[in-house]
Amino acid sequence: MKFGKTFANHRIPEWSSQYVGYKSLKKMIKEITRLQEDIYRAHNKNSYDEGRPPTKMRDSSNSAQNYLDSPKIQKLLASFFFAVDRDIEKVDTFYNSQYAEYKKRFERLLSSNQFNEIKSTLVVDANKEDAVAQTLLTKDTREMNMLLKGTSQASRLSYHKDDLIEIQSILAELRKQFRNLKWYAELNKRAFGKILKKLDKKVGTNQQMSTMKTRILPLQFANDSLITKDLSLLKTIWEQVTFRINSYERVMRSTSPNANANDNTEFFKIICVFIEEDDSKGLIRELTNLYSELSLIPTRIMISVLNKAALSKSLACIDAILKVIPSLNDSEDINRRNFFHHHIIAIGKLIRKQEILSRKKKSQPSKYTNSEGEIVTDLRTLHTTLSAPAESDSITEEEKSSACTLSYILEELPIHLRPCLFQHDNYKRTPLHYSCQYGLSEVTKLIIKLMKEWNIWNEIPIDDVSAFGDAESLTPLHLCVLGAHPKTTEVLLQSLDPNVKLKSSSLLHLATEWNNYPLLHVLLSSKRFDINYQDNELHETPLYLACRLNFFEAAVCLLYNGADLEIREKLFGWTAIFVAAAEGFTDIVKLLIANNANFDIEDEGGWTPMEHAVLRGHLHIADMVQIRDELVTHPHSQLNSGSEEKEPLNEISAGELNERNENGNGGNKGSLGKLAGPIKSYGHRFLDNNESLILITLGSNDTRNKSPSISLSSEALAKVIGLETDCALSLVISCNDSIDKSSVILDLPLDDNVDAVDFKVPFKVDYSHTLYFDIVPTYGTRSLETHNRIDCQKNNNNYVMARGVSMLNKSYSSVGVNRSILNGSVTVPIIANHTLEILGTLKFEYIIITPFEHPQLPLERTETYWKSLVSTRVIGHRGLGKNNPNKSLQIGENTVESFIMAASLGASYVEFDVQLTKDNVPVVYHDFLVAETGVDIPMHELTLEQFLDLNNADKEHIQRGAGHSPHHVNGADTALQKYRGRSVDDSDVSTLRRAWDLHDNDPNGKSNNAHWSDNRMRLTKTFKKNNFKGNARGHSIASSFVTLKELFKKIPANVGFNIECKFPMLDEAEEEELGQIMMEMNHWVDTVLKVVFDNANGRDIIFSSFHPDICIMLSLKQPVIPILFLTEGGSEQMADLRASSLQNGIRFAKKWNLLGIVSAAAPILKAPRLVQVVKSNGLVCVTYGVDNNDPENASIQIEAGVDAVIVDSVLAIRRGLTKKNEK
């Protein structure tokens, strides 16, 4: 997940309209870069026919290629900065307004009489808690004894604890508000830094530093010093108040052993007893005794006693208090709240506490699936299931009885006290606001009923901010929706006149984000909202939002109430089916299709939902939204045609592939235009002989591992770091050996799928490098370039709050010379700087790429070689093709004979798999397990001698076998020897078949030799899975295993090699049960490279591998031989994120300067137009798989612009393509 998604998901819902328009600004940058690319292409056209290397992609670091003096680009830049200025103004205005409001509330608290009365009793130094505790306990005991004796000082103590509890509640709310505002400011500051950095990187400007310095950093929201200071003071007071409350409770328990230790509602037992027994006379008598006269009792005490009596449903006590209480308002109340405010808040907290205590975690069956586990898509069935209110919103007996008691109070209330029910507190909230906030539907119903009876209720929209808005512009209806209270929401809506129209259609978006069916259904059933309302920023409807967030319940409710499925959002012209298909939300896609969503449509870039799903690896979803339009499924490339060039449908920057395929100028459906050819350049920067590269991945590339990369305990942070817990934190990664003495800064919390961090270091044989992971305050210790490197000398102990350290040469246990473990995950503790307590953990993976030396390394390719790389060609898979269990003549896969025949039949390259034996010799073999041994043994556990001798075992058996005369065997061997000595054509097939027929067969047509071979392998994992083994005698024309060096000598020099480096990924090793110990990767790659460079002699060579780290090493160790990244493209489930989809494969290949990708044919066949996505990113596109054995499939791909197809049936595909070209 990149910052764009993190930004959207981390916003505070009620403030969603007040954030930076990040996506809109991002789209504007894409428009600028698209125009730059158009100008660049017009000046630099590729000339493939002349055999010259293709033109490089536009380099934004080259000012001459940015065309910033172009009037069109200057106009777009002016529009961009105008939009940035408007966003800066919006964010700054909102932040200042909210901060002023929260600051005013805090200052009001600190200046209140209640706070001043208890301030002198607070702990001065919270760090001396143990020393002060005894003093306070003694003082509390003395005060409590004075209370019990009826002394005059007891009157103050009687309400101290209530004041403390209220102050604690206010502090908690203020802390939440300040923290939300702080996060709001931090998120927007990051967004500005990110978008300006993206502008500089993509467009080639140099605006981030200057704009941040002059326009953003001087503003208050970009500097958190004031709010951090407020939070620090607030935290100090919070700790002292909490300590004081706990002290009172200890005194109560020590002074009155029979008192209820859990009673937090009264200080003195006797008053509580009178209220609980509803003894009004005793209550009045005790109060009179305490204060001499009723008129001397503070209003605050009277309100507190009335509140307790109401909570206890003590009607007699209520009557007695109402007769003597002078007012329901306490002029000295901190928040200017009256009895009704306090009482409704107390009811809400009491019911919420009961719900928490009674809530039990139960695993309930899914409401969305039937008995077979299939998703239900019928709206009526789903509506019946989902429309029942949640248990948390049901009306409890406590609420009913509380509402009855409140009703009784209101009936007995003198007329002159009625306005108290509608009085505003300091937050501009009435009791109705609080009843809605806590979801008290019965109380809300009662208040509205009385307002109507007393002619106070005005028939105006309940969501009208001017009439009902509080200090934060939240109305009672807003509070109901934000609290997800459907019952209370229904009460509010039913109280309105049918003709009254509501003003806040955006409430549907807020309700959608709760994914609460009953809440949404109540809103929509009222018919007062526009169900298709589009927000102002992105024009997203509630249905689109539900589908983007994968909120099934919300989507069902919206569809049931008639939401339009075909409304498009603003940025890319996507409907709901687009975002659901692109994100891979299977259930949502099924639901939309069942409700007739149109998926045979294109977005603004000309792409269909099917193509978006394929690109992101969701092939099962692509099947659901598959379209049959031949203009999409059989596009025609104009790559080498002489027709007029057309704009491509879409060009995607590799850096943006984690988002959407946003760019796009439209274009005609089915016409790919003149595809941008692969424009990769070689001779790229690689490691010098004295350099290594450390590549660090925070977390894991394994998508099965869901644990966070960094886990910090909030409790430990609060305890150890103290006042700084409310400051923004960053992670600084540094290496002691970094050549440029730099560090990398990442703001916390980390975005998902953070790009790998790298350090170039001096080469050390023992890998003795040390990594530091420091937790530091975000502000005051960094340069203006967010997420860029800073001088590691600044990262000193004055700023480091906590640190984790990893010594890389000690991070794993040694498993042998040139051996390593596959699961390279390291977890280090994060230790506090001063206390040395563990604050959390950090998990990462790393690889160290060491340099490779060879005399032939500076070798350069000719222009003819470039031409061969960009011309469509056929590559023989494992030579002539991989073997299959069909009863037909087959030459053994990965054999010399197979490679020679493939070349003679028209293959430009032959593809084969290379692995290393135990004694470090590269051999040609496909499977990780060598089944020919009769046991499941991996290749790296066999020596070369043992591996090659496996063929001799077969020959010896044949020579000893009964029924096989010497002339039979010798005849076959003679024919095979004749075949091996030269290239072959189709006429050799009959000779080979006759030689094969010399072997005796059993009645079933299977040779005795095959029985012997099968019997030996019958217990191996490979044979059990396939009941077959390639290049096995009896199944194919088997030949001897061969080393990589032998291939260079035996295969004609004009035949190119596509060398697949076969190194297992973690999930592959687990599936094949290979164990965790493998060849050390640098040693593996260096060994293969040495053989290749020793024997290349001008041969065309391409490396390829499914393992991303192997590709990285091959790219960084040498600049000569191009590398292709093999990917399933989503056709198979892969654990490594980089191999999980075509999109991630493109990003990976682009980042590490690879020649291109080799994708499984399935995704390309489903969406052939995606070939241009690959090629517009400067990459070669090659495909493989059994689908390529169909000439029609190969033809479709080649017409779409695929550079090469790897096939098993070389002759058939070549003939098919020839016939196609002739037509």
Curated annotation (Swiss-Prot):
GO terms for biological process: glycerophospholipid catabolic process. Its cofactor is a divalent metal cation. Residues 1-213 form the SPX domain. CDD domains: GDPD_YPL110cp_fungi, SPX_GDE1_like. One of its GO terms (molecular function) is glycerophosphocholine phosphodiesterase activity. Disulfide bonds: none annotated. Residues 43-59 have a biased composition (Basic and acidic residues). Transmembrane segments: none annotated. Residues 872-1217 form the GP-PDE domain. Disruption phenotype: Affects the glycerophosphocholine metabolism but not the glycerophosphoinositol metabolism. It is found in: Cytoplasm. ANK repeats lie at residues 427-456, 472-502, 504-533, 538-567, 572-601, 605-634. Residues 43-64 are annotated as: Disordered. One of its GO terms (cellular component) is cytoplasm. It catalyses: sn-glycerol 3-phosphocholine + H2O = sn-glycerol 3-phosphate + choline + H(+); sn-glycero-3-phospho-1D-myo-inositol + H2O = myo-inositol + sn-glycerol 3-phosphate + H(+). A divalent metal cation binds at E911, D913, H926. Its EC number is 3.1.4.2. Keywords: ANK repeat, Cytoplasm, Hydrolase, Phosphoprotein, Repeat. InterPro entries: Ankyrin_rpt, Ankyrin_rpt-contain_sf, GDPD, GP_PDE_dom, PLC-like_Pdiesterase_TIM-brl, SPX_dom. The modification Phosphoserine is found at S653, S983. Belongs to the GDE1 family. Present with 2300 molecules/cell in log phase SD medium. Glycerophosphocholine glycerophosphodiesterase responsible for the hydrolysis of intracellular glycerophosphocholine into glycerol-phosphate and choline. The choline is used for phosphatidyl-choline synthesis. Required for utilization of glycerophosphocholine as phosphate source. May also use glycerophosphoinositol as substrate in vivo. This is Glycerophosphocholine phosphodiesterase GDE1. It comes from Saccharomyces cerevisiae (strain ATCC 204508 / S288c) (Baker's yeast).
